[in-house]
Amino acid sequence: MQKIEFEKSKIFNKPKIQTKRHTEIIESLEKMLEKGVPDLTMSEFASKLKISLRTLYEIAPSKDKLILMTMDNILTKLGKHALDSVSNIESPIRRLEKYLFIVNQAVGPKFDRFMKDIEKINGSKKMADYHENFISTYTEKLLNEAIEKKEIQQINTKVFAVLFSTIGREFLNEKNRKSISTTPDENANSITSIILNGIKLKN
C-alpha cells in the first residue's frame, strides 16, 4: 500500500538559514494577509512588520513571492492539521470525509478576502495546483482503502479524487459566488457528503 505523508511544499525556495526571527515574521505576515493582500511595496511591508528591508529580502526576493510563500505556509498548516485530525480514524471513508471537510476551509470565510486577491498574483495557480494535487493523491489512497474494506462500491478512484480536490475552487469562482448564497466551503462540503453517501455500501 502506498504510504503518503505530509511534507512541506517545495514550490518555493525558503531562506537558506531560517532563524527564529524569520519564523516570527512569516507568522506575522500570515495574520496580516488573512485580511487580504494589502497594496504595499516591499519597503512598506518591512515598515508594517517593523523589520529592515534587508531582513524581508532574506525571506523572499519580491512582493509576489513573499505573498505566495505566505499563502503556501497557510495552506500547508491547514493540510497538516487535516492529516493530524484524521490520523486515529480507522475507517478510510470516515477519515476521508473529515479530511475533506477540513481542507475545504481553504475556500471558507477565513480565507475569503485573501483568496480573491491572490488570484491576480503570478504563480498563484501553480501554488493552488500543488496543494490540490496533494489532496487528490491522498484522497485516491483513502478511496482505494475504502474499496478494499468494502465500505464503498467499485469506482474509478482517480476520477473521484480529482473531483473532490477541485470542488472548492469551482465554488470560489466569482460567477458562482454571486449566484449562490451559501459560502464556497459550505457548498463543497454539501456536494462532498452527497457524493460520499452515494458511493457507500450499505452493510
What are the functions of these language-model segments?
Residues 20, 24, 28, 32-65, ...:
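Helix-turn-helix
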Residues 42, 71-79:
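Short, basic, alpha-helical segments at the C-terminal edge of helix-turn-helix-like DNA-binding modules
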Residues 1-9, 137-149, 166, 173, ...:
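C-terminal peripheral helix-coil segments that are non-catalytic and often amphipathic
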Residues 85-86, 111-119, 171-179:
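Secondary-structure edge/capping motif, primarily at the C-terminal ends of alpha-helices
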